[in-house]
From Swiss-Prot:
One family name in Pfam for this protein: Dala_Dala_lig_N
Residues at which ATP binds: 184-239
Family to which this protein belongs: Belongs to the D-alanine--D-alanine ligase family.
Localization, UniProt: Cytoplasm
Protein name: D-alanine--D-alanine ligase
Cofactor(s) required, per the database record: Mg(2+); Mn(2+)
Record key words, sorted: ATP-binding, Cell shape, Cell wall biogenesis/degradation, Cytoplasm, Ligase, Magnesium, Manganese, Metal-binding, Nucleotide-binding, Peptidoglycan synthesis
Amino acid sequence: MTAPNHPPGRTRVAVVYGGRSSEHAISCVSAGSILRNLDPERFEVVAIGITPDGSWVLTDGRPETLAITDGKLPAVTEASGTELALPAAPNRSGQLLALGNGPGEILAAVDVVFPVLHGPYGEDGTIQGLLELAGVPYVGSGVLASAAGMDKEYTKKLLAAEGLPIGDQVVLRPGVETLDLEQRERLGLPVFVKPARGGSSIGVSRVTAWDELPAAVALARRHDPKVIVEAAVIGRELECGVLEFPDGRLEASTVGEIRVAGVRGREDGFYDFATKYLEDAAELDVPAKVDDDVADEIRQLAVRAFTAIGCQGLARVDFFLTDDGPVINEINTMPGFTTISMYPRMWAAGGIDYPTLLAAMVDTAIARGTGLR
């Protein structure tokens, strides 16, 4: 299906945030930053929050309500606004229905959705499938790439199939609680234990002795029944963004680096949730201090990873730079957009400011439309 015809004037963008995942608060913070930076001369914004139990709510979209304040994380509640529904009918593409005690009120249709959702039930293909069914264009990757990019098992399977450099890992499916001797010897110590379909370092543990493994697996399983145990990769943490333009052209951003080890007592080098969002305990170098040939290789690998997963619109690819070269760690199909997030910073370093970056994403989504492609 092609994109809807646009009436003269501004494009109506629904920014959807919150959601049912453990990354609810970070999604809210990302949305606040996006709401603050969407060009009001080009875009009319509709802010839609999703509560932790899955209710859709039309909010006032004030960015100041979506910030971390004195360590308190923001959240969407049913009191945040009017409950909404999105009819899954292409003949009503973008139509919103405000729910109430009566029959409901039909609201003006949106032209495009910006799903600023991190983690399961948002970044994993679920809302993308809903929007495809409803015939509403949306920012970011489609159903398959979103699902594959969210699941660390399948991300690495697809990257490996394309011959891209990845680290070693073992998947613990439901009912499997530990590693066997061969797996322990293969991975070595330390290892990182993660929910297979999670982000923002939530539920992640660094294990330095095998007797710590059961507790780490139990923590990860609070967020996902499928758990990943990754071999530690010794190297610098680098990131690179990929952006698709309306004409289908792909570009890679300036390369950035995250430095944690030795910063404010974080000698373990573990970039966890608190370090990312609460303690301001990481140093971000944009551009990264690497040789030009290394930066070029990172940028090329980022585009190859983007293509291997089948991404669209945007993604951030995370690397370790080892003595033997770059290793791809993860791909994020909807990276963070907070004030400290690397994705907008890396593009700004290359000359694309935040409002221009957001406009390019929306324009690409509209040009792409929905349906098989």
